[in-house]
Amino acid sequence: MLLYSDLTYAINGAAFHVYNKLGHGFLEAVYQEALEIEFQRRNIPYEREKELKITYDGVELKQTYKADFVCYGKIIVELKAVSALEDAHRSQVYNYLHATGYKLGLLLNFGSSDELEKERIVL
């Protein structure tokens, strides 16, 4: 069974709704604001631009990472508005998971003209 499958299903449903309403072509900030509204409407618990501590070899760093969203207190949701996801985007989420101790990240790209691109990244 997939990690947090029911929770990611709810998050993806909200993201699909936003993509179907807005389509592609907006800045990432537009999708972030719309997705926040959709999370509220669907009672999906979230924190927007949550500052996360990063640890290196057991030591907490001064630098932090701001996740676009953390949903349900355990899923990092990273938004993009680019023509296609690239390995650098996947690596970014993987590194965030590794550095913060979270186990699951969702990478959502609203910039594709074909459909909402979504990827699960599991640590």
Q: For each predicted feature, which ranges?
A:
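A short acidic/basic microdomain associated with nuclease active sites
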Residues: 40-57
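Solvent-exposed, charged helical/coil patches
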Residues: 1-45, 121-123
